[in-house]
Structure formats: structure tokens, C-alpha cells
Amino acid sequence: MILVIDVGNTNIVLGMYDGDNLVHHWRISTDRTKTTDEYGMLVKSLFDHSNVSFEQVEGVILSSVVPPVIFPLEQMSQRYFNVRPIVVGPGVKTGLDIHVENPREVGADRIVNAVAGIAKYDGPLIIVDFGTATTYCYIDEKRRYHGGIISPGIMISVEALYQRAAKLPRIELATPPTVIGKNTIQAMQSGTYYGYVAQVDGIVNRMKREVGEATVIATGGLARLISEHAETIDHVDSFLTLEGLRLIYERNQK
């Protein structure tokens, strides 16, 4: 089986593939201070809970937007699985034609999402990834990646409101019962949630005015919540990044 690892700023998502089937997946917090052995023991506990053994891991691929976490995960793969991992970056075959000023600046997560998006949905595509930052990427019908948009994630907005406004409480992100809030918490929830929904629809519509019609895919931890009221999202694919990692792994075995 193949272990795929997606390292984000807030969470690390791991998936285990048997062929092209995702048979297990886990989410843990990203911790820049963890050592190789600490990550190894954490992964072992996840494996034990799912009745998976280290010996079943035949290959590992990882993408990361947090450089300090790459080394301990590489070492973990070699020490505990006896496998040298593929790290998504320059020199790794993706099959994607990148049309931006500096291709090396494009985040590994955005490349991985684009690979999976084209394989599953064909182009043209707009992929919206709701993470610590929210990213919007455009890929045309010829598999050319043209760049996109990076904006602060919704949870950054929630936290900033609490930290910078003295009388406002920290809130849980939730869909309020009405747009017009009847109390402070509802008003804050409405502002963050519906404000973000409006941002998504506004940005996607502006992108479409520039490039024409495109299928819009949402992924990331908050994709389902936002898509409940976002009018421009066509599909929610929670495991798009994991699928992209699997595809890139396979392309680099040939």
C-alpha cells in the first residue's frame, strides 16, 4: 500500500491507498517541533487503531507547505517504513504545464490539487482549497496551470476579529440561522460565514469573467460548510489532495 502525506499549515492529512482505493485516512495537527521519532510513534498509533502495519507500506509520497516538517517526515519514512519518500517539488513528474512567472513559487498543495482535478474532472477548472489560507487556481482545458489567488482563510478572520476587537468574544464557526444576527455571536458568525461565502462567489465570478466558464471544485477542511451556501461551487471533493499525491506517485514509478 502507498502512504500519502499532505502537510498543511494547520493540519497534516495522511491517507493509505490500496491500488487506487483510499482505504484509510487520518488528520493530525501540524507541529514544527516534533522529532522524527515523535511523528513515527504518532503514525504508529494511527496505524494500530486501523489495524495497519508498517510492513504494509510499500511507498510514501508527501507534499508540504511547511518546510521545517519535511525533514522529520522524510526521516520517519526511511526509519520506520524503510522507504525513501517522494517529496513533491522540482524534478518530480506531475504532467502539469505550469504557466506562471516563477513555477518554483507555486505551492506543492496547489500543484497536487491541479493534478487530481484534471484527472477527475477535466478542464477548464477552478479549484478552491479552504485551508489556513484559501487558494483559487485556474487550469485550462490543455492541462496548463495559469496561477490564481491566495486569500486569508476564514479561521484567520475569526481569530483576528477576536484578537483585535476588545469586546468581541471568540466564536465557533457555524452557519447562523439568519443573515441578520439577533445577538453578538450570531452577528459575528454571520459576518464571517456569509462574508466568506460572498468572497468565494465574488472571486470565482471575477475569474470566470477573465477566463470563461469553468468547473469549480472545492476541497479542504471547510469546503462542505462553505459550499452549503456558495452558489458557484459545482463539486466538493474532500480528498482531492490525497488523490493528487497518489497520481503523482504512480507517474514517478514509470
From Swiss-Prot:
The keyword Kinase applies. Its EC number is 2.7.1.33. Homodimer. ATP binds at D6, V7, G8, N9, T10, N11, I12, V13, T132. SUPFAM superfamilies: Actin-like ATPase domain. Belongs to the type III pantothenate kinase family. The keyword GTP-binding does not apply. Its cofactor is NH4(+); K(+). Keywords: ATP-binding, Coenzyme A biosynthesis, Cytoplasm, Kinase, Metal-binding, Nucleotide-binding, Potassium, Transferase. Catalyzes the phosphorylation of pantothenate (Pan), the first step in CoA biosynthesis. The gene is coaX. One of its GO terms (biological process) is coenzyme A biosynthetic process. A monovalent cation. Ammonium or potassium. K(+) binds at D129. One of its GO terms (molecular function) is metal ion binding. This is Type III pantothenate kinase. It catalyses: (R)-pantothenate + ATP = (R)-4'-phosphopantothenate + ADP + H(+).
